[in-house]
Amino acid sequence: MKKESLADKLARKSFESAAFQQSWQVHMQAFGPILEPAFAGNYQAKIHLCAALNHISKRQLTQGLSTLKKLEKLLETDADKCAYLFFLGVFSEMAGNQEQWLALYTMANEYGHKLYLPYMKVGKFYLNGRMYEKAEENYRDAIDCFTATGLSAQDKIILGSAYGNLASCLLQMHRYEEAEAALNTSRSLQPDAPGRAAIEAPLYALRGDGEKVKECLETLKAHAPAIVNTIQESTDRILAKTDPLFFPQPLDHEKISAFWVWFGDYEDTLSGLLSQEDYEKALTPVAEKLLETFPFLEEIPNVALGKNEQGWVIRLQDLYAVAIMDAYEKLLAACPEGIQSRWQFDVAHE
């Protein structure tokens, strides 16, 4: 067993003091599942970590970050690394650096900790970005942080919200029965959650239940007026079976044929730009032509690039929209054999 140094003894004495414990317990209430296993027996590290968190609570970001960085040389276990990455993410989020906090929370989450908060934040980011599979994964990880028994009132609110957001992901991926089951769980945990009507309304519309849709819209008018018009427009389209997220749209087959004529003329330019590694310039005209071919897209679609042993792969992303899935299926079915022999195409949800 390693002999305790004088510095360790002083740090332990400070850590065990009433004043320090008062501050530490406040942080434990917020971040316990990450703090508890981190830096076990390393009181010097815990002193630095608590000091950094005190700076966080006062929004003293520069001082807090410099204090937190002192932990970098003290990382030994996965729990230590998880805590370090997570709190770096907290600082990045408070500083408004979205790309950085997303990366840091994601790295912390890979350690499988039991704090729901970063999973919820990452899940919300992916849900807003229409990356529903990743959003689902993070919401399920958040749900797994809670035990089935002994839930506090606050736990039930958070868990109810997680199930509601999970239902939203499942709805967008057309897994309607699973979405309904998640909503039922959300209702049982959090009966009074008027904002949930924004998720319930499209499900009722897909069933053709106009009366239930009206009830949801009335709830939103009273509790979330800022979003009611958007939800109503969506449910009106669903009830009329014209929403491209859920229903196929009329296609102009002459435009589909014209797309391939255009692509044949563009091949040499495309090959040249790809050889120069000017990928964005190469793919932008393809995306713009897709919008011209399928006007219901309303905005330039996502077109990505891959490569395998046969060569380039042009990847079209349908984002789980039924109309786009149908349109791309018809488009690729009409691809001339000559173009198929020179280019590869596939369709991905995300």
Residue ranges and their predicted role:
Residues K2-E4, T219-Q249:
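Terminal, low-structured helical/coil segments at or just beyond the last alpha-helical repeat
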Residues P33-N42, K70-K81, A108-E110, D144-K156:
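Flexible helix-coil transition and linker loops at the boundaries of alpha-helical arrays
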Residues K46, D80-A83, L117, Q154, ...:
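Start-of-helix register in tetratricopeptide repeats
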